[in-house]
Amino acid sequence: MSDYWEKRAAWDMYERMADAEDNADLVARIYRSASAQIVFSAQDIFEKYMTKHKLSKAEAWRFLNSFQDKDSIQKLLLEIKNKDSGKNKQELLKELEAPAYRARIERLQRLLQQVDTVMQNVYQQEQRFDTSFFEQLAENAYYRTIYNTQRKTGLGFSFSHVDQKQIERVLRMNWSGKHYSKRIWKNTDDLAKTIKDELLVSLLTGRTDRETAAVITEKFGGGAIAARRLIRTESCFFASELTAQAYKECGIKKYRYMATLDLRTSKIC
């Protein structure tokens, strides 16, 4: 009989993690929508074909890594002008400072600002989606554990209902060293910086519009993966924490914690 309840507990966790994947799918849509916004806004800024008077990718990254204010293209051009520059940089400046290129520079400047706005929106939506899901997950874990305990013992004992404050206390726990909302903020902020860097690399290296769109899409895909990883990790913790609280409510003094490696376990784990 104990084997049945072990399998039942494992199945309950499987269902909770399946729900976590569904929530991660919803968050991934937010990232895809944000990616589409940036890709659309980047249209007509970059050339359809590679231009010759540009820096190599290595040169562009070397320069950007030493440049602090990446929100101002004018300061970027001034920095290039002030540094010891070779023929390629002189030709690049001539092209970027030409009147015909001015409109593109202005659109790119607006796009850099738009990236911050878009990622702020991503952060707010992701935090709202995750918090709502974690609350439901925690409540479900609590009541499901008590229900299973009553079935296993055959006792219909009374128990305290889990309240919102109890769930909020668990959600506020910095169990991994940083609250999940701060981790979401760091992930979205890092992604915003990465996207802006890649847009500037496209400007300096002459990447085409299609190449730029592909890079942006790839980076947002990486952001969605980081968001999914966060949801999986936090979901597992919150479900386990409320399960433990439910056991305590049932008067259980000791329980055996069962863990297993799954296909998503990282190399560190």
Predicted regions and their residues:
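N-terminal leader/targeting and assembly helices and adjacent pre-domain segments
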Residues: M1-T217
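Acidic, glycine-rich two-metal-ion catalytic cores of nucleic acid-processing enzymes
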Residues: G222-C269
